[in-house]
Amino acid sequence: MRGQLLPRTVPAWRSRADRFDDLVLDAVERLEARWARELDGVEFAVEDVPPSDPSPWEHGEVPLGRFFPADGALPPRIVVYRRPVETRAADSQDIGELAQSVVVEQVAHLLNLTPEEVDPRYNRDS
């Protein structure tokens, strides 16, 4: 038997990367409900892995996300790294929780607040 096993409209057809994008989007939308004005113009992105040149403050540990401040004409940007999050997560449910925590931590960095101020449901143990 050759051909598709599942039609493209079935949720199981979606790739892990697509599902991860959805998790990050859900996390961003949840924060935008509270911080809409502060997050206006901020770009959010998902990349598979971080660049090989770590920032000076990253000491040997692979980053799960990164905040890039506005630079000239470029708007501020928050990037979540899919593969490191998936690798660090204990299971598939943990991926969503960890992605949420990464987004909260990076937004906190952007707003110069603690993660708990950004999202009272933030869990440091994620």
Regions found by a protein language model. Give the residues of each.
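Active-site scaffold of zinc-dependent metalloenzymes
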Residues: 61-100, 110-126
